[in-house]
Amino acid sequence: MSLFDTIRNTLVPVHKEGYIFVGAFFVGSLVLGWIWEPLFWVGLLLTLWCAYFFRDPERLTPQDDDLVVSPADGRVSMIQMVIPPEELQLSSDPMLRISIFMNVFDVHINRAPVRGAIRQVVYREGSFLNAELDKASTDNERNSLVIDGPRGAIGVVQIAGLVARRILCWSVPGQALGVGERFGLIRFGSRLDVYLPAGAEPRVAVGQRSIGGETVIAEYGSAKGPVISRRS
């Protein structure tokens, strides 16, 4: 491994959405240090934590249309057959839902579980219940995407939680997403739901940790052998 690769793998970049927060924390550190020098170091630690929260690491994403990758880092909190929210306009029949809960220490970048074109993006206001509750999927503030993937349309729902009060989505209808491509983030703890059509089988278990853009959470059909992965 070259020195450049070592540095790149060690220093994880900060996503641009975090620049203003990191900058504000650092300025606050300078002000605190001017008041009393030891407070500067407290502020600096908080600045480093803020940079850590908005970290945006590269991922090695499997390139196989029969695989569905995790949309976020976190813990698999639910795997259920449920009727998707009305705003997705996907099906009146139950679909496989896999939920990923992100705590404040997880990477909060959200990634496309499959490749495809965005059919719609729908934002809904709502409550800020604990994102681990089942009813958070219908009661909480959320932003929903429908992606027309190679094995059918899927739903991806960003759900705000107790602490998370800001959902960001920079992707728009008609945009083509590659599998593992970044489409948004949620600040300070939240949940991602993925709704999958018939034929998808879960490949994770409740309680398992997932890595956004890398961990295979579901699969269509059977494995066909080695899978190529690309950086995303």
Swiss-Prot record:
Q: Does the keyword Membrane apply?
A: yes
> A single Gene Ontology molecular function, please?
phosphatidylserine decarboxylase activity
Note the Pfam families from the entry.
PS_Dcarbxylase (PF02666)
Residues with PTM Pyruvic acid (Ser) = 190
**Catalytic activity line of the entry:** a 1,2-diacyl-sn-glycero-3-phospho-L-serine + H(+) = a 1,2-diacyl-sn-glycero-3-phosphoethanolamine + CO2
Q: How does it sit in the membrane?
A: Peripheral membrane protein
Instruction: List the subcellular locations.
Output: Cell membrane
What InterPro entries is this protein classified in? PS_Dcarbxylase (IPR003817), PSD-A (IPR033175)
> What superkingdom heads the lineage?
Bacteria
Q: In which pathway does it act?
A: Phospholipid metabolism; phosphatidylethanolamine biosynthesis; phosphatidylethanolamine from CDP-diacylglycerol: step 2/2
One of the record's GO cellular component terms = plasma membrane
Q: Which residues form the active site?
A: 190 (schiff-base intermediate with substrate)
Q: Which cofactors are reported in the record for this sequence?
A: pyruvate
Give the E.C. number(s).
4.1.1.65
- PTM annotation, UniProt: Is synthesized initially as an inactive proenzyme. Formation of the active enzyme involves a self-maturation process in which the active site pyruvoyl group is generated from an internal serine residue via an autocatalytic post-translational modification. Two non-identical subunits are generated from the proenzyme in this reaction, and the pyruvate is formed at the N-terminus of the alpha chain, which is derived from the carboxyl end of the proenzyme.
Q: Where is this site: Cleavage (non-hydrolytic)?
A: 189-190
| Keywords associated with the record | Cell membrane, Decarboxylase, Lipid biosynthesis, Lipid metabolism, Lyase, Membrane, Phospholipid biosynthesis, Phospholipid metabolism, Pyruvate, Zymogen
Q: How is the cofactor bound?
A: Binds 1 pyruvoyl group covalently per subunit.
**Entry's Gene Ontology BP terms:** phosphatidylethanolamine biosynthetic process
Q: Which family does it belong to?
A: Belongs to the phosphatidylserine decarboxylase family. PSD-A subfamily.
The UniProt subunit note reads as follows: Heterodimer of a large membrane-associated beta subunit and a small pyruvoyl-containing alpha subunit.
What is its biological role?
Answer: Catalyzes the formation of phosphatidylethanolamine (PtdEtn) from phosphatidylserine (PtdSer).
Q: Which HAMAP family match?
A: PS_decarb_PSD_A
**What is this protein's name?**
Phosphatidylserine decarboxylase proenzyme
Q: Which gene encodes it?
A: psd
